Amino acid sequence: VRPHRTYFGEKDAQQLRVVRRMAEEQRLPVEIVGLPTLREPDGLAMSSRNAYLTLEERRAALVLPRALELARTIVECEGVRDADRLKEALADCIRREPRARIDYVAVTDYETLEELATINRPALLLLAVRIGSTRLIDNTTLAPNRSP
């Protein structure tokens, strides 16, 4: 079978970029299509891992979509461009949730995934957070050209 298109969720943004890059480098005749992250009504990204969360952990997991919204506000409304300043603000937000342990908070170039010091072009905010023993990932696009 030789597919013309393959679909990947944007929830795992790193995987999507790596697969796209591999397809380009190998000159594979396939279109890699990214699909938006599906979310629960309360904003938590849908994931098979959510089934491992207790009720209390499920509530605690809402710190991820809250952190994403905070990031968009800081960059797009307040005009902050310093990636370290943004990451520290998000780490503070996440640490307020006692059940959350940060694996990483990263700000990268939207396409290359290169870490950014300054958010001066389209970027990805990538989060990996453990809630109890369950590792959850999420991300959002940051658009620094949206003026406050």
Question: Whereabouts are the PLM-identified features?
Answer:
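Divalent-metal (Mg2+/Mn2+/Ca2+)-assisted nucleotide/phosphate chemistry catalytic cores
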Residues: 1-7
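Glycine-rich, Lys/Arg-enriched anion-binding loops that position phosphate/diphosphate groups
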Residues: 5, 12-103, 108
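Active-site flanking residues adjacent to catalytic metal/cofactor-binding acidic residues
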Residues: 9-10, 137
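Fold-independent oxyanion-binding glycine-rich loops
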Residues: 10-11, 129
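Phosphate/ribose-recognition catalytic cores of enzymes acting on nucleotide-derived substrates
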Residues: 88-148
